[in-house]
Amino acid sequence: MERREHTYGYEDAAGVTPPPWTGSAVGLMDLDAFFASVEMLDHPEWRGKPLIVGGDAESRGVVSTCSYEARRFGVHSAMASAEARRLCPQAIWTHGHFDRYREVSAQVMAILADETPRVERVSIDEAFIDITPGRFAPEDPLFVARRISDRVAALGVTCSIGVGCNKTVAKIASERDKPFGLTIVRPGTEQRFLAALPVSAMSGIGRSAEERLRRMRIYTLGELSRAPESTLASIFGVNGERMRQRALGLEISEVTSLDEERKIKSVSNERTFAKDLTERGDIEAAIALLGESVGRRLRRQGLTGATVTLKLKYSYGSGRSAQRRLPHPTDDENIFIAVALELLDNIWQEGMHVRLAGIGMSDFDHQGGIQTDLFCEVDDRGAQSSDRRDLSVAIDAVRDKFGDAALTFGRQSRFND
């Protein structure tokens, strides 16, 4: 496969050398159909064929990822396996091997770290890099990105890379020419690059936000960038102006290095309620909602924690917390939420009014990930089961694409603060 390469604003300027890069240069490296690509690396006979990595249709599994050949039939991540089998009955199915994916991911991350000290892993198959000339890279970002692309391809998998002045531009650029694409958005061309794109192209705008923007007759990022600040604030609050700045290509974002990631001591989420919670069912639902956010952040950062902390503050101002150590590190919210609900008995009794609740994970295994096969069952509490990890990955994918409200669980419907 030949790499597709574009330098935005200079596609039709044959022989014209773009001016030197000024300011920050952020890249987003995204491995193409990563799980499926690794399976094809280990099974060359599967190359060029529709391949699906996921759970069985018979056991109501879901698709974790699939090859581009399968995507042509309408199969996509987070789809029910039964529907995927109906759309593409000729597909090859595999249950995947997470240890192997971690191994290849580590090789790719090592390449990035060799090119720049500023590498921020977003997930097992995606990372931001700071390749600002003269700061973290010795040459123009185009040459650094080309070299990374070539070095990753030499491992037997491909990646798509977008480069721009900030994370928003880099992320959108990385999706322009998948698979095996390289898109460079030179300084000064950001607004032209973004203007015609639909608002959904920008991360953080899910289905609900997109619908509200449509009601305002805002369909493109260009229209969003021209919307009055007061109008956006009336609908989205303080996030409205941030959305507008991102649509203008003016986001200021810093890439966090791997060393800085390893300094993270805990990942937590807490919320102060407009009205005190007094019913156990409502408190449990709030803890579950907060715990889901923590689990998703752990998976994004490749972290697994071994200590669960539950924190409550009461209406009269005082608060209490409780901790428990798990037998195995995990990023599975089903495991640590269940433990947090057990801890609730230690710090809450009927009649107490809860003003704030928080849940956190700490004591991280910085190797990241679950040290078991992606789709095998493990019975001990703290080691994540395969079906749950499959489901967690699928839910993350749906929420990343359609927003957090796209999928909720029944117990959370009780919590409607």
Located regions from the model:
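DNA-contacting surface of Y-family translesion DNA polymerases
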Residues: G15, P19-P20, A201, A209-V354, ...
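Acidic, metal-coordinating catalytic segment for phosphate/diphosphate chemistry
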Residues: H328-D417
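Short, charged/polar surface micro-motifs in flexible loops or helix N-caps
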Residues: F34, A57-R60, S315-G319, F364-Q367
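Short Gly/Ser/Thr- and Asp/Glu-enriched loop/turn motifs at secondary-structure junctions
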Residues: V122-E126, G164-K167, L303-T307, M352-L356
